[in-house]
């Protein structure tokens, strides 16, 4: 089980939002590359970047900060990136410039043909972010909830060849209210591709509970506010996950 630190970018800074609302942003650092190196030094094996301005604008907006992070990490661990990625040219640019996985969210829901083309053009490097509220998919930086069922869409996207599904419960994201493990397990059981959990991680107990069900196909968990505010110690979390992994082998 990978514990994946989130670096959310707004106006070039590392922030966290509550429930995806841009006005509810807490700035944690004005130097995102320093944050990336901090997590790398603490044993992170993958990073999760989100261009928040890009997610709302529908096009990349934090290019300078993303470049700085990629240069600082220097290929030592994989980086996944989402937010405002709506065309093949943007995907190609990011993958050519140090990003390992590109996460498609809104565009996957609104223009499924684009996702299909992306998976064909860049096999093994496309993830889909499904942001859910009460089992329905939200789009446009979480500002609109659609009528699409999360599991139905995920199955369709799996057939396209996506590498993994990142499942975020937006009612819990940034709220430190605990993961929606039940919904994540239900999704993972319906799929054969990996599911990465996100939204609401609070403490080691959440990590322990998630590790108990990882055999359902949950390979990682993204955490943000908890590791920045200190309710979850990143090193302890990854050590616990490794320990529980070893116990199940």
Swiss-Prot record:
Subcellular location as annotated: Cytoplasm
Catalytic activity: 1-(5-phospho-beta-D-ribosyl)-5-[(5-phospho-beta-D-ribosylamino)methylideneamino]imidazole-4-carboxamide = 5-[(5-phospho-1-deoxy-D-ribulos-1-ylimino)methylamino]-1-(5-phospho-beta-D-ribosyl)imidazole-4-carboxamide
Any one biological process term the GO annotation gives: L-tryptophan biosynthetic process
GO cellular component: cytoplasm
Main location: cytoplasm
Pathway: Amino-acid biosynthesis; L-histidine biosynthesis; L-histidine from 5-phospho-alpha-D-ribose 1-diphosphate: step 4/9
One Pfam family cited in the UniProt record for this chain: His_biosynth
Active site: 8 (proton acceptor), 131 (proton donor)
Alphabetized GO MF terms: 1-(5-phosphoribosyl)-5-[(5-phosphoribosylamino)methylideneamino]imidazole-4-carboxamide isomerase activity
EC number(s) per entry: 5.3.1.16
UniProt KW keywords: Amino-acid biosynthesis, Cytoplasm, Histidine biosynthesis, Isomerase
Family: Belongs to the HisA/HisF family.
PANTHER family in UniProt: 1-(5-PHOSPHORIBOSYL)-5-[(5-PHOSPHORIBOSYLAMINO)METHYLIDENEAMINO] IMIDAZOLE-4-CARBOXAMIDE ISOMERASE
The protein's name: 1-(5-phosphoribosyl)-5-[(5-phosphoribosylamino)methylideneamino] imidazole-4-carboxamide isomerase
The species this protein was found in: Nitrosomonas europaea (strain ATCC 19718 / CIP 103999 / KCTC 2705 / NBRC 14298)
Lineage of producing organism: Bacteria, Pseudomonadati, Pseudomonadota, Betaproteobacteria, Nitrosomonadales
């Amino acid at each position: 089980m990978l514990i994946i630190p989130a670096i959310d970018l707004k106006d070039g800074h590392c922030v966290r939002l509550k429930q995806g609302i841009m006005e509810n942003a807490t700035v944690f650092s004005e130097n995102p590359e320093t944050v990336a190196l901090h997590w790398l030094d603490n044993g992170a094996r993958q990073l999760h970047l989100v261009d928040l301005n890009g997610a709302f604008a529908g096009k990349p907006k934090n290019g300078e900060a993303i470049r700085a992070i990629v240069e600082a990490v220097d290929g030592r661990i994989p980086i996944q990136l989402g937010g405002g990625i709506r065309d093949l040219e943007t995907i190609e640019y990011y993958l050519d410039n140090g990003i390992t996985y590109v996460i498609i969210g809104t565009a996957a829901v609104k223009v499924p043909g684009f996702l299909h083309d992306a998976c064909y053009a860049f096999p093994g490097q496309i993830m889909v972010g499904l942001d859910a509220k009460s089992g329905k998919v939200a789009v446009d930086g979480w500002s609109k909830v659609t009528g699409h069922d999360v599991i139905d869409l995920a199955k369709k996207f799996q057939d396209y060849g996506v590498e993994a599904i990142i499942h975020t419960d937006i009612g819990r994201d940034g709220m430190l209210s605990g993961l929606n493990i039940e919904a994540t397990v239900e999704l993972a059981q319906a799929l054969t591709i990996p599911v990465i959990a996100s939204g609401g991680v609070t403490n080691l107990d959440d990590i322990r509970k998630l590790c108990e069900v990882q055999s359902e196909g949950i390979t990682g968990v993204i955490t943000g506010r908890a590791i920045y505010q200190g309710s979850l110690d990143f090193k302890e979390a990854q050590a616990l996950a490794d320990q529980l992994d070893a116990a199940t082998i």
